[in-house]
UniProtKB/Swiss-Prot annotation:
Gene: RIR1
EC number: 1.17.4.1
Annotated site location: Important for hydrogen atom transfer: 223, 452
Positions of the catalytic residues: 435 (proton acceptor), 437 (cysteine radical intermediate), 439 (proton acceptor)
Protein task: Ribonucleoside-diphosphate reductase holoenzyme provides the precursors necessary for viral DNA synthesis. Allows virus growth in non-dividing cells, as well as reactivation from latency in infected hosts. Catalyzes the biosynthesis of deoxyribonucleotides from the corresponding ribonucleotides.
Annotated Gene3D superfamilies: 3.20.70.20
Record's keyword terms, sorted: ATP-binding, Disulfide bond, DNA replication, Early protein, Nucleotide-binding, Oxidoreductase, Viral latency, Viral reactivation from latency
Paired cysteines (S-S): 223-452
Subunit structure: Heterotetramer composed of a homodimer of the large subunit (R1) and a homodimer of the small subunit (R2). Larger multisubunit protein complex are also active, composed of (R1)n(R2)n.
The name this protein goes by in its record: Ribonucleoside-diphosphate reductase large subunit
Length: 789
């Protein structure tokens, strides 16, 4: 069957485009690299082989010529086209497995759909093709569905199934349709709104939505938070089999609170919680062994757990032997304020500051936070219930050493997460953990799981140019961001309705909370396109304004749903929202740029309610940023030359904006190549290559995450925290000193600063750039992608 399709003649239009593209590459001066020729009437298979040979030959040269990087991406899109099939075959493909309602909706509007796809080929698709090689490969290898005979879903069909799914479930709720479009509400208007936002890469769905949207396979939720009542192996096994296993098999990322499994090793149970962690590790590895999307688990513990030292030593070289090594799962410290208060006392010079560990006799501490936690913890210490006591600086060192050497634990601030939740958790029992990537804050218990559905706004698509007759530079269009936020709100709500969920407890969590996780990607790219250094006051101001507008328009859309007759989320009457409180009210010194809009929204929420309980979560966008060629999430770029190993080999992704700037500064080819040689010798660091350039120099803004002051990056997270009602997956980027000795105090000082600034996530990954690093950041190094969009 594969031979039948691939052996057919490739459409002449595709062959013509390939020849045109190759001729353009030759005009760049790369004729010698293109010695192979394409047969006069090639088959599809011959076209695939030819493009693969050409791209493989040119890939290494992308590091010195951004034009090749773009051209290779265009060639890969032509390779994709050579594998595309017609709409009729796609609709009936058993591998695509479209849901009945999606297939029926397409057939009912087939003329409009075909017209939309034809328009896409000559408009949005041209822009997509010119993004670059990594974007094209990511679509080809991961997101476009495979069919028998070597066929591949087309880009238009990919966006079609997502837009149709969202349209169908939006049309089932007239209020959702009315929020999405003004004026006439009809299927074609709703479809066009979704298709335009998706194909234009303004709204970027999470990876599960891109993989499974519109299909009768998989779940579209990204994040699951579990807090089963697990106290020993007897209660742990059912939790693993009934909740963890099904979610992992559906490719969901899991945050799992296990603090209550806190019986220290005894003769009857010689390994304590480590036996459970080893089982969980093996389960995760087994499920990932045959999946197209790796998944993961992060286990949450508080630092007073009896086995905390063993937990912190479970990965990599720190594990004493294979029986306790757990390299397939992560850990996160769910840290109370008291820990950092005591560490600060040590830093201030006070001696003898200890940290006490407790077993399950203190399990009730899990349900407490703030002053209540502190009082009870200290009472238990005075009463002698502790099983061990460690100098606070030693405990801090163990945490930091593990993070630096193994990439785990992450660290979150328990009290801040509970303090800023939309319910008063003092009456409900404290939140005990987050998700896999530390950006989702939801209450979970033995009756329901926390579940979050994600999407991000591609910020570079919110830039606009002045009218043609007016001189000026690009500017950030807040109206475009507002429209994108509202569209994303309706889109994710529609996908929430469309999705199935792996377990009953997960379904209940979705139905009762309707939690959205809207984030951003391309923040650093946006600054660069606006000619702003990330450290500039203008960038810091824009950073806050973006977060404010995202929250405002998402909440406004959700409140309007209730205003139009939909019911608020369960428990709204008991939430802070019902009292007119908004997320930023709990933060000091917040300046609003949309004060009147917030005042009107506050009134509407009190009167009508909110359809969703949560809105904004700044997630990592490791995977989806590859298809947009934007910087990941809210982080600066890691390097100016990114290396990504894919199914087709290594791909070098240059910083295209930097490369274009260098080309404009050095128009002579010999001077440009010399500048790139200098940059490569300096490990792709502009500062290392050209020194401290004056402010305003075209190259001065191209710093990497490792070159920025980490305190400043933490401050940027804190500046927008008032408008992020969930949390932010904030990583630290540390450069190792030349002598290779990295003091733990350097990282602890950053964690203390994050704590003092009131963040909820103190550290997602701690990324270390070794003194011997060549400046090429390798994708996959200690990076979890399962819930990273």
């Amino acid at each position: 069957m594969a031979l039948d399709f691939l052996s057919t003649d490739c459409p002449l239009g595709i062959v013509s485009d390939i020849i045109s593209n190759v001729n353009t590459i030759k005009e760049y001066g790369y004729s010698s690299e293109l010695s192979t020729t394409l047969a006069p009437r090639p088959s599809r298979e011959q076209v695939l082989e030819y493009i693969t040979r050409v791209v493989d030959k040119l890939k290494p040269l992308c590091r010195v010529d951004e034009r090749l990087y773009i051209a290779c991406g265009e060639l890969v899109h032509l390779r994709i086209k050579a594998r595309n099939t017609d709409l009729k075959y796609w609709l009936k493909s058993s591998e695509i497995d479209l849901s009945d309602v999606v297939e029926q909706a397409i057939l009912e509007h087939i003329d409009f759909v075909q017209k939309t796809l034809n328009s896409f080929e000559t408009s949005e698709y041209r822009d997509l093709c010119s993004l670059g090689l990594q974007s094209a490969l990511k679509y080809e290898e991961m997101y476009l569905a495979k069919m028998r005979g070597g066929r591949l879903e087309s880009m238009g069909q990919f966006f079609l199934r997502l837009a149709t799914t969202a349209t169908h479930y939006t049309m089932e709720q007239p209020a959702m349709a009315r929020v999405l479009v003004s004026g006439e509400v009809g299927w074609t208007y709703i479809f066009r709104a979704f298709f335009t936002a998706l194909a234009g890469q303004v709204v970027i769905p999470a990876t599960p939505i891109m993989l499974f949207g519109g299909r009768d396979c998989g779940s579209m939720a990204s994040c699951y938070l579990l807090n089963p009542r697990v106290t020993d192996m007897n209660s742990a096994i059912p939790a693993l089999m009934e909740e963890v296993g099904p979610i992992l098999c559906n490719r969901g990322g899991i945050g799992l609170s296990l603090q209550r499994f806190n019986t220290p090793p005894t003769e009857g149970c010689s390994r304590g919680v480590m036996a459970l962690l080893k089982l969980l590790d093996s389960m995760t590895m087994a499920i990932n062994s045959d999946g197209e999307r790796p998944t993961g688990v992060c286990v949450y513990f508080e630092p007073w757990h009896a086995d905390i030292r063993a937990i912190l030593n479970m990965r990599g070289m720190l594990a004493r032997d294979e029986t306790v090594r757990c390299d397939n799962i992560f850990a996160c410290m769910w840290t109370p304020d008291l820990f950092f208060d005591r560490y600060q006392r040590y830093v201030d010079g006070e001696s003898g500051i200890m940290w006490t560990l407790f077993d399950d006799t203190a399990s009730h501490l899990c349900h407490m936070y703030g002053n209540d936690f502190t009082r009870e913890y200290e009472r238990l210490e005075r009463c002698g219930f502790g099983i061990d006591a460690i100098p606070i600086q030693d405990m801090a060192f163990i945490i930091v050493r593990s993070a630096v050497m193994t990439g785990s634990p992450f660290l979150m601030f328990k009290d801040a997460c509970n303090r800023h939740y939309h319910f008063d958790m003092r009456q409900r029992g404290a939140i005990m953990g987050s998700n896999l990537c530390t950006e989702i804050i939801q209450h979970a218990d033995e009756t329901q799981n926390g579940v979050c559905n994600l999407a991000s706004i591609n910020l570079p698509k919110c830039l606009a140019l002045p009218p043609p007759n007016i001189a000026g530079v690009p500017y950030f269009d807040f109206a475009a961001l507002g429209r994108a936020a509202a569209t994303a709100t309706i889109f994710v709500n529609a996908m929430m309705c469309a999705s199935t969920y792996p377990t009953v407890k997960s379904q209940k969590g979705v139905e009762e909370n309707r939690s959205l996780g809207l984030g951003i990607q391309g923040l650093h790219t946006t600054f660069l396109m606006l000619d702003l250094d990330m450290a500039s006051p203008e960038a810091h101001q824009l950073n806050k304004q973006i977060a404010e507008r995202l929250l405002l328009n998402s909440m406004k859309a959700s409140a309007t749903l209730c205003k139009l007759g939909m019911q608020p989320f369960k428990g709204f009457e008991d939430s802070k929202y019902s009292r007119g409180e908004l997320p930023f009210d709990a933060y000091p010194n917040v300046t609003l740029t949309n004060r009147n809009a917030w005042r009107r929204l506050r009134t509407d929420i009190k009167q009508y309610g909110l359809y969703n309980s949560q809105f904004v979560a700044y997630m990592p966008t490791v995977s989806s940023s590859q298809v947009t060629e934007s910087s990941e999430g809210f982080s600066p770029v890691y390097t100016n030359l990114f290396s990504k190993v894919t199914a087709t080999g290594e791909v070098l992704r240059p910083n295209v904006l930097l490369m274009r700037t260098i080309r404009s500064i050095f128009p002579q080819e010999c001077a440009r190549l010399q500048a790139l040689s200098t940059l490569e010798a300096a490990k792709w660091s502009v500062v290392g290559a050209f020194g401290d350039l004056p402010v305003g120099h075209p190259l001065s803004k191209f710093k990497t995450a490792f070159e920025y002051d980490q305190t400043m990056l933490i401050n940027m997270c804190a500046d927008r925290a008032a408008f992020v009602d969930q949390s932010q997956s904030m990583s630290l980027f540390i450069t190792e000193p030349a002598d290779g000795k990295l003091p733990a105090s350097r990282i602890m000082n950053l964690l203390v600063h994050a704590y003092k600034r009131g963040l909820k996530t103190g550290m997602y990954y701690c990324k270390i750039k070794k003194a011997t690093n060549n400046g090429v950041f390798v994708g996959g190094d200690l990076v979890c992608t399962s819930c990273s969009l």
